[in-house]
Amino acid sequence: MKKTLLGSLILLAFAGNVQAAANADTKGTVTFFGKVVENTCQVKTDHKNRSVVLNDVGKNSLKDKGNTAMPTPFTITLQNCNLTAANSSTNKANKVGLYFYSWENADKENNFTLKNKTSTSNDFATMVNIQLMESDGTKEIKVVGKETEDFVHKNATGAGVALTQTHPDNDHISGSTQLTGVTGDLPLHFIAQYYSLGSTTAGKVQSSVDFQIAYE
C-alpha cells in the first residue's frame, strides 16, 4: 500500500513538472508602448476626403513587374496645430505627418501598394496597383495593412522592458515635417502613381487609403 501510494505521488509530481514545462512553452506576454502628446493638429475640412485623378497611361508602360508611371502630386493640409500649448509641455511632438493604412487594400505581396478595385463586369485593369510616394519621388510609402509586421521592436526583450531606440523605418509616418515655427496651414505633399504587378491589362483603376495624423 505504501509503495503504491509512493508511486502515485511520484507520478503526480512528474505530471506536475511536465504540465509546468508545457505551460511555460505555450504562453507569453506582449507589451505595448505609445505616447499621447499635447499637439492638436487637424485636417483641413476640404482635405478630409480627397479624389486624385491620374492621367490615362498606355499599358505598354506597365508591362513588367515594378514598372511605375504617371507620378501625380497631391496635398493634404493640416491646420490649428496649437503650438503654444504644446511647447509648454514635456509631452510635445517635434514633427507631424500622416499614417496611411488600409486593411482591405494594402498589398503585402507587392510592396504594400494599394490593390486595384475588382469587378465582375471585367471593366477594371488587372495586374496594376497604386503606389504612394513621399514628395521627393524616391522614397516609397508602405501602406499599413492587417499583415504589416514591422511594428515589433527587436530590442525590447521582455515584458515591461522600455525601448532604447526608435527604428527609423517602422513608425510609418509619411510627410514628416518639423512643427517648429509653423503658423497657419501646414501642407503635406505626396505622390501617387501606377505600379505594375506584371503584364497590365487595359481598364479602369480605382483604390483608396485611409489616413490619420501622427506625431514624432
UniProtKB/Swiss-Prot annotation:
Which cysteines bridge via disulfide bonds? C41-C81
Gene3D superfamilies the UniProt entry points to: Fimbrial-type adhesion domain
Any Pfam family the entry gives: Fimbrial
Which GO BP terms apply? cell adhesion involved in single-species biofilm formation
From the UniProt annotation, give the residues forming the signal peptide.
Answer: 1-20
Known InterPro entries for this protein? Adhesion_dom_fimbrial, Adhesion_dom_fimbrial_sf, Adhesion_dom_sf, Bact_Fimbrial_Adh_Pro
Q: Where in the cell is it found?
A: Fimbrium
Protein origin, superkingdom: Bacteria
> Per the record, what is one GO cellular component?
pilus
Which key words are in the record? Disulfide bond, Fimbrium, Signal
Q: What does this protein do?
A: Mediates adherence to oropharyngeal epithelial cells. Helps the airway colonization process.
Instruction: Please state which protein family the record places this protein in.
Output: Belongs to the fimbrial protein family.
Name recorded for this polypeptide: Major fimbrial subunit
Organism field: Haemophilus influenzae
